[in-house]
């Protein structure tokens, strides 16, 4: 089934295209591994990048990568069927992350942080195995803003995410082309196109990451007084003025 090319599609496509241009996310000859978790964000990213690939002035290739972490009930076959129906080159990686996490996790710690680290390492390895020089992740505008607030409130750091950065392995460039796309656009886009959205089936899915949920609620409250608060916070990430901060490592 082809994507529904309505105004919402056009808006998302244009914002992804602008992010690619602003941060030089995609270049001639790139091979891009797109991490597809089964969530609305990664499906949206994959389909928009494929749409742009067919129309872009530069040539690049994409492939989908899914990691099955071994959580009971996770239906990787549903993702695989969707990818096959839409003609995507894909690799489905089966792991026992669930078993590792159960063994290594401290009783008072979250599944999420350990799971994310394990997945990240596998994603980097798969990108190298398939000669992909870039790894595309589905973090959207709200993720950038919430991460900024989380680091300020709970870590004491002015840090968010980067739209493009060299991974820890020094070989793979991680890109986040949805940086300009708000979650409120992705939700109806995914629903309208009937993407088979799946839960990761983690035992604490839906209850973990309470701090991020608190940031979402805070932003909703702020938006009632200032509808442009998210745009302003995102703009702030591109308008850093170190001279007016307290980092003693910065020399003037």
From Swiss-Prot:
Alphabetical list of Pfam families matching this protein: ATP_bind_3
**Which keywords accompany this UniProt record?**
4Fe-4S, ATP-binding, Cytoplasm, Iron, Iron-sulfur, Magnesium, Metal-binding, Nucleotide-binding, RNA-binding, Transferase, tRNA processing, tRNA-binding
Give GO cellular component annotations, separated by semicolons. Answer: cytoplasm
**Note on cofactor:** Binds 1 [4Fe-4S] cluster per subunit. The cluster is chelated by three Cys residues, the fourth Fe has a free coordination site that may bind a sulfur atom transferred from the persulfide of IscS.
Which residues are noted in the entry as [4Fe-4S] cluster-binding? Answer: 112, 115, 202
The EC designation for this entry is: 2.8.1.-
Q: Where is this motif: PP-loop motif?
A: 37-42
| Cofactor(s) listed in the protein's UniProt record | Mg(2+); [4Fe-4S] cluster
Domain of life, per the record?
Answer: Bacteria
Name the SUPFAM superfamilies on file.
Adenine nucleotide alpha hydrolases-like
Give the protein family. Belongs to the TtcA family.
Subunit composition and interactions:
Homodimer.
Matches recorded under HAMAP family: TtcA
Protein role: Catalyzes the ATP-dependent 2-thiolation of cytidine in position 32 of tRNA, to form 2-thiocytidine (s(2)C32). The sulfur atoms are provided by the cysteine/cysteine desulfurase (IscS) system.
Protein name (database record):
tRNA-cytidine(32) 2-sulfurtransferase
Species in which this protein is naturally found: Geotalea uraniireducens (strain Rf4)
């Amino acid at each position: 089934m082809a994507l529904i090319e309505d105004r919402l599609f056009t808006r998302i496509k244009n914002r992804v295209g602008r992010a690619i241009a602003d941060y030089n996310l995609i270049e001639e000859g790139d091979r891009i591994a797109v991490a597809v978790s089964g969530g609305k964000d990664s499906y949206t990213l994959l389909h928009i990048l494929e749409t742009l690939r067919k129309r872009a002035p530069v040539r690049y290739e994409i492939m989908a990568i899914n990691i099955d972490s071994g959580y009971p009930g996770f239906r990787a076959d549903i993702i695989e069927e969707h990818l096959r129906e839409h003609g995507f080159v894909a690799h489905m990686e089966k792991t026992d992350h669930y078993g590792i996490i159960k063994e290594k996790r401290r009783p008072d710690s979250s599944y999420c942080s350990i799971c994310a680290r394990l997945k990240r390492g596998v994603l980097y390895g798969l990108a190298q195995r398939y000669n992909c020089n870039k790894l595309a992740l589905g973090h959207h505008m709200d993720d950038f803003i919430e991460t900024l607030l989380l680091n300020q409130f709970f870590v004491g750091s002015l840090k968010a995410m980067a739209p493009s950065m060299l991974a820890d392995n020094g070989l793979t460039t991680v890109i986040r082309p949805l940086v300009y796309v708000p979650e409120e656009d992705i939700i109806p886009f995914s629903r309208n196109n009937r993407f088979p959205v799946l839960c990761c089936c983690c035992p604490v899915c839906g209850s973990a990451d309470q701090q991020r949920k608190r940031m979402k609620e805070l932003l909703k409250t702020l938006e009632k007084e200032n509808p442009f608060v998210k745009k302003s916070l995102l703009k702030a990430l591109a308008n850093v003025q170190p001279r007016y901060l307290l980092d003693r490592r910065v020399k003037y």
